[in-house]
Amino acid sequence: MKKLAQPKFIYLLAFIFALSVSCGSPPPKPPKAVKTVAFVTNTTSDFWKVARKGCEKADAELPDVTVSFKTTNEGTVEEQNRLIRQSLDRDDADAIAVSPIDPVGQKNVINNAAKRALIITQDSDAPDSDRTLYLGADNRAAGRQAGELIKQALPEGGKIMVFVGKREVQNARERFDGLKESLQGSKVEIIDLMTDDADPSRAMQNAADTLKKYPDIAGMVGLWSYNGPSILKVLKSLDKVGKVKVVCFDDERETLDGIKEGAIFGTVAQQPFEYGYQAVQAAAKILKGDRSVIPGNKTIFIPTLIIQRNNVDEYSKKLNQLLGST
């Protein structure tokens, strides 16, 4: 009997094995009719309530997109990383719009997520990661705006303390750098930058400790949204309103009320509604293959607004309309 040639026999076995594997494998998944965009915050505050309204507007306008809004309640990297993984593993997210808490420490998490989904950073950037797009404020320029405000509030100069949640967050670093740039050569002196781990109670304690340690302090600058209200509560409790000038960021209700009362000199307001709305809209277009929305520098700056006593009523009215409140 003629024996089967050894090479041919091996090829035949390989063919049979490949055929059996292919027959037993499940068919490829069809493309999802509805894409999921996860929107992940870096903490909890009224700022993100406004951003959520923007997400909801985009969600309502896009029949082939659903938005999963995720709040980082504790403001920790670990919690935010868990929400990113949850978005991928449980929600099967096609895109994630995230405000990174620690852009350096989370680089690997962001890069790994980018292998499975479109990653957009919003509010705060992770420029050295594999994110596709950053959408938010020019935070260095916003810091310079805050510097101009505090110089107007303190024409004779004086010492100021600066407050923020976490100094390692990209927007915190850039705002502080912009503030320092604006104050170079002026009579305003920065004592230090105090952090509170995104805890409003600690923010209040920092303000109180500052007033005790530096009784001659002339001004306070809060770089995150809750810092202004935290500073104001302490000033009111110690009868220091008007004696210490306050400049802050964003448009929490207590901040706007403080401006109306003359207790806060001014605020640099971002447009979180646009962060939510534009992030979802951009993600939807990119997921459809339209990459024309991505600029050459992979950055879309949304302008910040200066709110003071002369325009706070008009701004508050527009904000209430966005939120659907009166």
Where are these regions (language model features)?
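C-terminal motif of bacterial Sec signal peptides marking the signal peptidase cleavage site
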Residues: 19-22
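Flexible loop/turn connectors
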Residues: 241-242, 249-307
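Hinge/beta->alpha junction and helix N-cap segments in small-molecule ligand-binding domains
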Residues: 40-53, 69-79, 102, 124, ...
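Flexible loop/hinge segments that line or gate small-molecule binding clefts
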Residues: 101-141, 149-152, 159, 250-260, ...
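Bacterial Sec signal peptide processing site at the extreme N-terminus
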Residues: 24-34
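Bacterial N-terminal signal peptides that target proteins for export
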Residues: 2-11
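Hinge/cleft segment of the Venus flytrap/periplasmic-binding protein
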Residues: 163, 171, 181-183, 278-326
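Hydrophobic alpha-helical
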Residues: 94-113, 179, 191, 197-258
